[in-house]
């Protein structure tokens, strides 16, 4: 577990971008313009938020083992666990994230958003980045639960290339 637990969510001045998907355009190849959201606003407007970081859209572990769990359990998270938002964070651009979300079967972003963290700024601020080259950073594989503005769970995988343990939806469910 991280030293972020039991502390106020570290929103700072960080923002993310995502592209909304609705039932009417879920099967279309059209693309909308990205929306920019301040982390502080998202956290203040929602009582319970799950945030999970993934190294790369369309990568094998992210696409097969990590993110599908959140999509498969979304109804349970929202209806039974009263989660307001699930945010999937990568450093990929919002267009790639939207295409990835659609490829995973997301048809509505009311409760799940695929967020772009430009320059890995937010992820680096919480210490969950993954150095992949000379000054190049991706998001590590991690998960966080924020309830009423307080971090109640935060953990990062030690081997983000293959492991999906502390960042899995099952691990998050155990901490709700």
Swiss-Prot record:
Organism name: Saccharomyces cerevisiae (strain ATCC 204508 / S288c)
Residue positions of the active site: 62 (cysteine sulfenic acid (-soh) intermediate)
Crosslink (Glycyl lysine isopeptide (Lys-Gly) (interchain with G-Cter in SUMO)) position: 156
PTM description: Conjugated to URM1, a ubiquitin-like protein, in response to oxidative stresses. The attachment of URM1 to lysine residues exclusively depends on the presence of a peroxidatic cysteine in the target protein, with low specificity for the particular residue, motif, or structural context at which urmylation can occur. The URM1-conjugation reaction is mechanistically and directly coupled to the process of cysteine persulfidation, transfering the sulfur atom of the URM1 thiocarboxyl group to redox-active cysteine residues in the target protein if it is exposed to oxidative conditions. Persulfidated on specific redox-active cysteine residues. Persulfidation (also called protein S-sulfhydration) may provide a molecular mechanism that enables cells to protect vulnerable cysteine residues from reactive oxygen species (ROS) under stress conditions.
Protein known as: Peroxiredoxin AHP1
Cross-link (Glycyl lysine isopeptide (Lys-Gly) (interchain with G-Cter in URM1)): 32, 48, 79, 81, 107, 124, 156
Cross-link Glycyl lysine isopeptide (Lys-Gly) (interchain with G-Cter in ubiquitin): residue positions: 48, 81, 113
GO molecular function, one term: thioredoxin peroxidase activity
């Amino acid at each position: 577990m991280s030293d972020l637990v039991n502390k106020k969510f570290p929103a700072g001045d960080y923002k993310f971008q995502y592209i909304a998907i609705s039932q009417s355009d879920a099967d279309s190849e059209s693309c909308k313009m990205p929306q920019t959201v301040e982390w502080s606003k998202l956290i203040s407007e929602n009582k319970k938020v799950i945030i999970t970081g993934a190294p790369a859209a369309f990568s094998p572990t992210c696409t097969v083992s990590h993110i599908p769990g959140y999509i498969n359990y979304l109804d349970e998270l929202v209806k039974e666990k009263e989660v307001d938002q699930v945010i999937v964070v990568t450093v990929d651009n919002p267009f790639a994230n939207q295409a990835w979300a659609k490829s995973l079967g997301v048809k509505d972003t009311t409760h799940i958003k695929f967020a772009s963290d430009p320059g890995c700024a937010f992820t680096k601020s919480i210490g969950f980045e993954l150095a992949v080259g000379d000054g190049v950073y991706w998001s590590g594989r991690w998960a966080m639960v924020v309830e009423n503005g307080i971090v109640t769970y935060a953990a990062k995988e030690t081997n983000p290339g293959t492991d999906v343990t502390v960042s899995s939806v099952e691990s998050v469910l155990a901490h709700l």
